[in-house]
Structure formats: structure tokens, C-alpha cells
Amino acid sequence: MISPVVISRLIDEKKSMENGAILPQAIAQPQLCPTKPALARRDGVSMHRRFALSPDRLGILTPSDDQGLETEPLSTGDNLGKGSHSGFSSITITARRVGPPASSLVWDTFRDPLCPKCKAKDALFQEPPVLAGDAHLCQHNRPFTCTESPSNGSVEGMKVFQAHSRLSARQDYWVTHTNDNEDSFSSDNSPSRKVPLVFSSCVHFRVSQQCPNAIYYLDKSLSVPLERPQIASPKMHRSVLSLSLRCSSHQLTADGVDSSANGEPISTALSQELSEGKQDLLGPQWGQPQGGHWKESPALVPVHLGSGTCPRTGSPPLENVKFADVGRNQVPVRKEKEDHATCTSSSHTNQLSIHIPGWSYRAETKVLSGSKKQQQEAQRTLPAFPVGQKTIKHFPPEGDSSPSSDGQPSILSESNERQHPYFMIPRVPLPGFYCPLQTGCASLQEDGAVQIETHFPKDYTCCDLVVKLKECEKNEDPTVTPEPSPATPSPSTPEGAQSSDPSEDSYEPLLASSMTLQEALEVHRPQFISRSQERLQKLKRMVQQRKTQQKESLGQKQSLLPVRANKKQFTIPHPLSDNLFKPKERCISEKEMHMRSKRIYNNLPEVKKKKEEQKKRMILQSNRLRAEVFKKQLLDQLLQRNAV
């Protein structure tokens, strides 16, 4: 954190240099200790070192295994860079701007002034960031090289170089710049024109061509206060992501010199507008601001990536750079391509990937094809994903996408894009790639830029990537409406479709709009109507036959029964109807009553028991009689034997 004392000292130095040189005051950073070689995978290399600015002095925080974080005071002596630490640590640079109270500021968006240091040393930033509207912040990482062993393919080590000179092109420094009409940051000297309060920062480093197929992780954050100004107008922050790509080739042009000597930069810049009336574009961390709290937000991060040859001449795959952030915002990316005479198309894929987890992505494509420069725009708005999800979207090379001569993408590319509308890692193509991303979805415009430029010596090729992020917040304002996006031009239709009969084309919508269902059936399905009419007639005939049969059956029944004058005539109901006739209960005769009573009496349990006992007595009596008869017969036989 930069204390107010340091800022006031810088302001005093600036006031003394108002009539002198234009170059703003620079604070030199110390030389970094070179890190030891660390083993890593071939596809992943990360460099981390932590910096911090003390309130009373500038210092470097380096990780220590025994004592934690140690502060090394800044100095320009010869004792810099003596100690060495194993492994890598992350680079964290923070700054605080002490300015007028929030009530005297107007939160708005404006174009940042150019950074003279960046513009003089490296034409990479077309629009460097501004710190707090008055202070200009620009931080550069030193270039580092990462040598790769050809035998095993593993990374041998990483070295961080720096220059002791203050005016070195790759020296880390903080630049503080104020306008001429403002001489302090205090609230007493507030400017007459209320300046927007903007917080931003940048990181700039270059990757050598000796590290193909490597992944570098950058972590650049910026502390931003969340307190709001006390004004009646809608209060909001603004979020911007800017990408800048540069690539140079050492190949010779037709006149025998390289492209840098000819001064033929491929420089294209686009801008996107962010509608400030959309509430769902804001991340959850910007919901309710709290006084005295600070929010870390991503800032400007330029990255230089290198390859052995021109990206469009079939060189090995370029490094993949991934940026990690936990916000949920819209990341606008707009790409523009110009055909260059020194580079030829190839089937090899050299791609650059940006990974921002949890962010929505919308890409707008504008293609300039050759000298015709026919433009084509496409937009896509995607919902945010959980932080853990990582889906990769690939942009095929220009040779594989087979675009038409006027910059129109193929229909197959459009269908593929519609089938996969959600992705998290947009692939930013280099200046030899064609982006087929197209959709007609209307969404909000956002600020951002992608620049592709050739401005490097001919001994190596390098690609630079600049990322500029600003967080945004706003109150719900129903009067603000989102700005509709331009419609995507539809691809040209083939000649065969255009040569079709115009009468048929006009007849189809006429049928769909003016015809009724019956008319449409008569035209397209005449047999359906005829069959329906036949079924209706058949049902009517069946009803008539049923009625005649019922009348005949009723006449026969009435003729069989005698007609009695004294008997009331009742209608005979249908047997299946619910309205059945119930006649009177008839009278029971005496005989029937006696039989009924006897049947009930015999079924009584006492009567049944009595009948069983009586039956047993009859059986016993018959057995006695049989015994007497047997005795008598036996006696007679004995008497006859004796007589003989």
C-alpha cells in the first residue's frame, strides 16, 4: 500500500517538473533475485513472486520457510539479488489512492490517457489504465526465458532478468501522473470538473520462443473501495476487459527485408460498448457495498507469448495462457483480422486460450478480408458457470474453416456454434485464424479491445496479450434499458434457392396466415374430409335403425298382453335406463305365509336339535326290536336240535 506521504512527495516532484520534461516521475523497483530452476510439466510452467508496498517505504515480500514473509527494503546498491529462494511464488502488487471523498466524485467511464513510458519503450498498450482518474499506474514484469530440454521435454528452469538502469525498457516501476490543473489528492483541493474515480493496473511480460506448449498463470489484482458517492444519479461501476495481441515474423517480404523494416504492422483495434442498465451482468461480490471495505478485482495483464516461426506458417503450437478469476461478469472480446502478405495459411493450430472461471463470455467478430474489407459482426452472450467447470471452445484455423471470399463463415461453422452455445475458455485466435462465432442473439454492448500488431525484431517471433479488467456495480434503475446489439448478417443463400418459383414462396405464407383449418384440409387432405363425412352419415343411419327396431318391439309386446280398462297403463322403461319403473309389492297368500313360517321354524336350532334326538330314539327302538327277534330265532333253533 502506498501511504499518503509517498503520494504527496510524488505530487510535489510532479509540480516541480511541470515546466520540464513530460516523462512522469518513476519509482524504480529493486532487482529480483533469480529463482532456482524448478521441475514442472511440459505443458505447465508458473512463475510466482510476491511484492508489496509498505505504508512508509517500498519493499519486497519474499516467502521464507522458517520466518514466513520477510520485508527487504528497496535500495539501488550492489547487494541486490544475493539471496535465492527455491520454487516459485505469486506476484502481488497493490496500490491505494488517497483522493477526495466519494461525495465529490462522479462515477462514469472515460478513455484512459496514454502511458508515455509504455508508448516510448514498447508500442503494446493502445489504452493503458489510469489510477483513480488522476494517478497513472503502469507496472511491467521483466522478460523471462524458459529453456526446454529437447531430450525429455521437461522444463529445466526459469530466469527473471532485469536492468539496473532506470530507463530500461523492461524495468519494473510505478508511474504517478497528475493533470496540470490538479496539484493534490486532498479533498480541500477538489477539481472543478468532477473526475471519475477509476482503479486499474497492468502487468507486462514477454515469453521467449524457446518454450512451446507451456502454460503460464498470472495473478494480478487491484484493490478498489466499495463506498459509493452520495449523488442522485444512478451509481455504478464499470467492468472492462481489454485484450491486445502482437506478433512479428522474421520472414522476408517481396522486397527482401522483414516486415518490421517495411513498417507493415498488423494493427487492428475495436471497441465495445457496455450498457450500464443491466443488473444481471453484475457479479455477486458487487451486491451491497460496505464502507471501509476494499475489493480485489483483476487489472491490466499484458502477456507476451513466443513461437519459433510466424503463427500462420505451421510452427509448433503456441503457449496457452490462462487467467483465473472468481468473479461473475461479462468478458467482452472482439477480434479483427487482416490478411498479411508475409504469412501463408497452414493447417497447424497455434492458439491462445484465456481461462476466466465463473465468467460469462460474449465474443464479437469483425472480419476484414483482403483489400475489400467487408465487415462482419457476430455476438454471443453466455451465462455464467460455476467456478469449477472448465469447458474449452476451440477456434479452428482459417484454412480449416473455409470462409468465403467476402468474409462469410460456412454454414457448418454456424451450426456447430449453435449446438455448443456454452463454453468457459474462449480461444483467442492469432492473426492467422478465422473465428466462425456467429449468432443473432441480442445482448449488451461492452467496452474492450483486441489489438494485433507486428512490431518486433526479426530474430524471434512474439505474441503479446493484454488483459484489462474493471469491476462494475450499479443500482437497479428501471429507466435504463439495455442497448440492443446489431443483428448478425445472414450468410448468402445459394443460387439454386434464389431461382425457385416466387409464386410458391408467396403462396406458402398466404396459406399459413389466411386459410382456416377446413380450407387447409380441403387443399392438402381432401380424402380426410370425405371420410369424415361418410362416418357422420353412417352414424345417423345407425341411430335411425335403432329407433325403428325399438318401435317394432314395443308394438309386438302390446298386442300380446290383454287390454284392461280398469288397469292403469304404465310406460315400459328401457332396461338399460336409470329411470326404471318399480311396481307395487304384491299380496302374499295364506298358504305361502304358512310355508314360509314353517320353513323358518324348521331352521331354528332348537327344532333341529329336537329332531336329532327323536331320530336317535327311533334308531335305538329299532335295534331293540331286532335283538328280540334274533333271540327268538336262536331259541327256536336250539329247541329243534334238542328235539331231534
UniProtKB/Swiss-Prot annotation:
Task: Quote the subcellular location field of this record.
Answer: Cytoplasm; Cytoplasm, Cytoskeleton, Microtubule organizing center, Centrosome
- Required for interaction with HDAC1 as annotated region, ranges: 67-175
Question: Which GO MF terms are attached to this record?
Answer: histone deacetylase binding; ubiquitin protein ligase activity
Q: Quick one: a GO cellular component term?
A: cytoplasm
Q: What protein am I looking at?
A: (E2-independent) E3 ubiquitin-conjugating enzyme FATS
Record's keyword terms, sorted:
Coiled coil, Cytoplasm, Cytoskeleton, Transferase, Tumor suppressor, Ubl conjugation pathway
Pro residues: bias regions:
481-492
Induction and repression of expression: Upon DNA damage by agents such as ionizing radiation, UV and actinomycin D. Activated by p53/TP53.
A biological process (GO) of this protein is: DNA damage response
Q: According to the UniProt entry, which residue ranges have a biased composition of type Low complexity?
A: 398-410
**Record region (Disordered):** 62-83, 305-349, 367-413, 475-507
**Record region (Required for interaction with p53/TP53):** 1-67
**Gene assigned in the entry:** D7Ertd443e
Q: What class of enzyme is it?
A: transferase
Role description: Tumor suppressor that is required to sustain G2/M checkpoint after DNA damage. Acts as a p53/TP53 activator by inhibiting MDM2 binding to p53/TP53 and stimulating non-proteolytic polyubiquitination of p53/TP53. Exhibits ubiquitin ligase (E3) activity and assemble ubiquitin polymers through 'Lys-11'- (K11-), 'Lys-29'- (K29-) and 'Lys-63'- (K63)-linkages, independently of the ubiquitin-conjugating enzyme (E2). Promotes p53/TP53-dependent transcription of CDKN1A/p21, leading to robust checkpoint response. Mediates CDKN1A/p21 protein stability in a ubiquitin-independent manner.
Q: Point out the coiled-coil segments of this chain.
A: 598-629
Q: Name one Pfam family in it.
A: Centro_C10orf90
